[in-house]
């Protein structure tokens, strides 16, 4: 995938270079003209056709490379949604387990408090009275 991304970046850089060169060459070699008139000289300009063909070929190569990338956008959303549903189910299960543990610990605390109470009563009753 990284190779394709590098290749895509190289192709985009090449296309930008072609466009920049085309503008520079056409600007330097094109004779002045009016915007509303089409001149025969401009239609016969060989550089225009060469640069147009090069840019079109570069654009087509970029399109072909982009089409070769794996499409995962829709699948990723489905996978994320399924994972969230699974996480919610696990969370509910863990919350239930936690509530059970809290209940058990509350019972154990009560039992320990009762035993401590009994121990203190026994100790108080076993002391000699003064």
From Swiss-Prot:
It comes from the Eukaryota. Belongs to the Mediator complex subunit 21 family. Its main location: nucleus. The keyword Zinc does not apply. It comes from Caenorhabditis briggsae. This is Mediator of RNA polymerase II transcription subunit 21. One of its GO terms (molecular function) is transcription coregulator activity. Keywords: Activator, Nucleus, Transcription, Transcription regulation. GO terms for cellular component: mediator complex. Component of the Mediator complex. Component of the Mediator complex, a coactivator involved in the regulated transcription of nearly all RNA polymerase II-dependent genes. Mediator functions as a bridge to convey information from gene-specific regulatory proteins to the basal RNA polymerase II transcription machinery. Mediator is recruited to promoters by direct interactions with regulatory proteins and serves as a scaffold for the assembly of a functional preinitiation complex with RNA polymerase II and the general transcription factors. GO terms for biological process: regulation of transcription by RNA polymerase II. The keyword Transcription applies. The lineage of its organism: Eukaryota, Metazoa, Ecdysozoa, Nematoda, Chromadorea.
């Amino acid at each position: 995938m990284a190779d394709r991304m590098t290749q895509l970046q190289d192709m985009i850089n090449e296309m930008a270079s072609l466009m920049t060169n085309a503008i520079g060459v056409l600007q330097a070699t094109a004779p002045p003209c009016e915007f509303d008139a089409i001149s025969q000289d401009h239609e016969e300009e060989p550089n225009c056709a060469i640069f147009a063909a090069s840019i079109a070929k570069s654009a087509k190569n970029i399109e072909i490379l982009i089409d070769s990338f794996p499409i995962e956008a829709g699948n990723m959303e489905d996978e994320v949604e399924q994972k969230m549903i699974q996480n919610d189910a696990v969370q509910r299960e863990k919350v239930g387990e936690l509530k059970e543990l809290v209940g058990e610990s509350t019972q154990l605390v009560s039992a320990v408090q009762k035993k401590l109470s009994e121990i203190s009563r026994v100790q108080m009753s076993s002391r000699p009275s003064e």
